[in-house]
């Protein structure tokens, strides 16, 4: 069993949500068992609006609201919901460290499995392996892992509390080996070796999605602080994308560029 160590400085509070299965513009529904994300990724778009939305004064990455009634609420909503694909999750990582304690994502998967709602799971955590037994019970399921760079030091800088690159690659390989449809999300494009990254993804990901750094103006100071300003330019995104595409095509891997 994989247990993750929680950040002792994290402010955690248990709350009761009013809704857990919500309409999405990307999939039919999205499901977020938590408000806040301990991974604290420097580039996360959620930090732009979720602190204000949640009413927290703490910086993004330093608070989590645990929706303790999520499984019960989901069970009720599924009784009247039209079947559709559920994205887990849109504004938090469903397998962030606190999930090893509360198991809300697992309990929600149990409810979704009873109704056979298709699921699309996206994470940066190897903790997803804990729930392979449940995921395998879905007739329609897809699991994606975000791997924005092959460089462990860069990943640690931008995604300080997420699983290591190696842990994510190993998880993706194991999930794929079980016959589950998989994808790798290379986004946002971070410094690294694109050819090596694609090589590592071969025979692990059925499809690769590529996206650039969005909201660059809000994170420019972060790049400047760590002397990475050259990786925050249109030239970098364009050239890095092309190197990824060239290597993907060379290896005849399916991909989609999202910008």
Name every feature range the model reports, one short phrase each:
Residues 133-151, 206-219:
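Non-cysteine beta-strand/loop elements that form the S-adenosyl-L-methionine
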Residues 73-74, 104-108, 131, 164-172, ...:
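A general structural detector for well-ordered alpha-helical segments in enzyme core domains, enriched
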Residues 2-142, 150-153, 165, 177:
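Conserved Radical SAM active-site core
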Residues 159-161, 171-194:
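Conserved strand-turn element in the central/C-terminal portion of the radical SAM core barrel
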Residues 91-93, 124-126, 146-150, 187-189, ...:
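Active-site beta-loop-alpha junctions enriched in small/polar residues
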Residues 85-87, 118-120, 142-144, 181-183, ...:
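Structural preference for beta-strand elements that scaffold enzyme active sites
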Residues 2-16, 22-23, 189-259:
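Auxiliary Fe-S-binding modules of radical SAM enzymes
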Residues 110-113, 136, 169-179, 245-253:
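Surface-exposed amphipathic alpha-helices with a cationic face
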């Amino acid at each position: 069993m994989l247990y993750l160590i929680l950040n002792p400085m994290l402010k955690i509070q248990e709350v009761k949500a009013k809704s857990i299965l919500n309409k999405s513009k990307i999939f039919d529904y999205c499901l977020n068992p938590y408000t806040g994300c301990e991974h604290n990724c420097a580039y996360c778009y959620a930090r732009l609006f979720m602190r204000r939305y949640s009413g927290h004064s703490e910086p993004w990455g330093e608070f989590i609201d645990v929706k303790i009634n999520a499984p019960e609420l989901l069970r009720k909503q599924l009784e009247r919901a039209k079947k559709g694909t559920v994205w887990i999750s849109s504004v938090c990582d469903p397998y962030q460290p606190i999930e090893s304690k509360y198991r809300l994502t697992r309990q929600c998967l149990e409810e979704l499995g009873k109704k056979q709602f298709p699921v699309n799971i996206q994470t940066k955590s190897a903790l997803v392996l804990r729930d392979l037994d449940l995921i395998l019970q879905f007739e329609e399921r897809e699991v994606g892992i975000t791997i924005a760079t092959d460089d462990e030091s860069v990943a640690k800088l931008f995604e300080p509390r997420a699983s290591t690159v190696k842990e994510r690659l190993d998880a993706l390989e194991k999930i794929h080996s079980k016959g589950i449809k998989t994808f790798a999300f290379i986004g946002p494009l971070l410094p690294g070796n694109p050819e090596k990254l694609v090589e590592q993804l071969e025979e692990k990901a059925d499809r690769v999605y590529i996206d650039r750094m969005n909201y660059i103006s809000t994170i420019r100071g972060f790049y400047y602080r760590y002397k990475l300003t050259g990786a925050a330019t249109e030239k970098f995104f364009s050239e890095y994308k092309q190197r990824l595409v060239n290597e993907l095509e060379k290896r005849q891997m399916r991909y989609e560029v999202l910008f």
